């Protein structure tokens, strides 16, 4: 009986490891929202880390989070390191490319609770009187991440946060005088 149980456990472990081994080497999470405003309105909110408190889904998770800013006030070279509780961890963002009212690319380095280095891109596409804002995150999937993804995907982990952030971004960009 014990030998049979051990064999079942080994088969399950090997199965999970096998599934992890065939997971993709990279991940992509993407969400979008239509904003009833010209592209410059949402662009101003994502291109300036000082304004992320108006819409970022993670800002409210730790009111005592330590934030700082370095480099230019906005655009390419703007840097935003943070350190907070276990819900937000610690890390650093840097705008690596900013194309006015069309695109913002950010290098996102997580330091805690796990290390990860990803790229986040906000693309703003005019659609008549509105703007489609697309939020995309891509990054590598080391084996530990692949193992985790057997049970829960990156999309399931952070997709809901992207959706919540885009709802807040939409509201902030559509606010009169934004």
Residue ranges and their predicted role:
Residues 67, 170-178:
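Short, highly charged C-terminal tails/helix-capping segments
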Residues 4-67, 72-73:
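Hydrophobic ligand-binding cavity/cleft-lining segments
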Residues 96-97, 107-163, 169-171:
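Beta-strand/loop substructures that line and gate deep hydrophobic ligand-binding cavities in soluble
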Residues 49-99, 147-148:
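Extracytoplasmic/periplasmic/luminal assembly and interaction segments
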Residues 32-36, 81-83, 94, 105-107, ...:
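Generic structural detector for well-ordered beta-strands
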Residues 39, 43-52, 77, 92, ...:
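Extracytoplasmic/secreted envelope proteins and their assembly/folding machinery
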Residues 23-25, 72, 85-87, 112-116, ...:
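A generic structural micro-feature
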Residues 28-30, 88-93, 115-121:
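Short, surface-exposed coil-to-beta transition loops
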